Amino acid sequence: MIQTTFPDRAVMAELVAKMLWEIKAVHFNAGEPYKLSSGMASPVYIDCRKLLSYPRIRSTVMDFAASTLMRDAGFEQFDCIAGGETAGIPFAALLADRLGLPMIYVRKQPKGHGRNAQIEGNMPEGSRVLVIEDLTTAGGSMFKFIDAVRAAGGIVDHGIALFFYDIFGQQRFTDGKVRLHHIATWRNVLAVAKAQQLFDDKTLAEVEAFLDAPLAWSGRNGGVCELSL
């Protein structure tokens, strides 16, 4: 199904933030911080995989993803959608269906030998590939998949994350010549928390302290205090 409606960007961000709260995908624990794949300690965590269990929400989020891409990237910019193992795979399938495109998935580790050892599915040489992940912090994990696609002969100029932490900017993507698209960020989630009084004042202050200085907060709480972006 090709997306033909284009909701306001701010409306989409707010609605996705509300959906994440509604399905209890937002978690907070400053006493025992979450360890992100980057090695950072974080008092907050988003479980975007829960979106898959709620069909109406899942469908709406994928509609938003499709409209975001067609508005900001174009209608004929991609030949294939790639999902990263594991969380990106179902979202890649859903988005490929929305856009009427083939889908592949990228393994975390090669299986066998050769240029396509990490790629499952058919990706002709020179295919313009969009890589999708459920969420990204600084882009480290997404670029492992992007690099694998490029090594196999694909062209990757765009990536999309349904949720972007948005605490380090997009330098990694700029350096890697990839335009990152996203729908919602932690600031959107925090705005909903404030409006609906979902966090008490102490919790809000702790979350804001992390968002304002994430590496300093991480270092004080057992995580890394610098990243190689």
Swiss-Prot record:
Orotate binds at T137. Keywords: Glycosyltransferase, Magnesium, Pyrimidine biosynthesis, Transferase. One of its GO terms (molecular function) is orotate phosphoribosyltransferase activity. Pathway: Pyrimidine metabolism; UMP biosynthesis via de novo pathway; UMP from orotate: step 1/2. Its cofactor is Mg(2+). It catalyses: orotidine 5'-phosphate + diphosphate = orotate + 5-phospho-alpha-D-ribose 1-diphosphate. GO terms for biological process: 'de novo' UMP biosynthetic process; pyrimidine nucleobase biosynthetic process. SUPFAM superfamilies: PRTase-like. 5-phospho-alpha-D-ribose 1-diphosphate binds at R107, K108, K111, H113, E133, D134, L135, T136, T137, A138, G139, G140, S141. Its EC number is 2.4.2.10. Homodimer. PANTHER family: OROTATE PHOSPHORIBOSYLTRANSFERASE, URIDINE 5'-MONOPHOSPHATE SYNTHASE. Belongs to the purine/pyrimidine phosphoribosyltransferase family. PyrE subfamily. HAMAP family: PyrE. This is Orotate phosphoribosyltransferase.
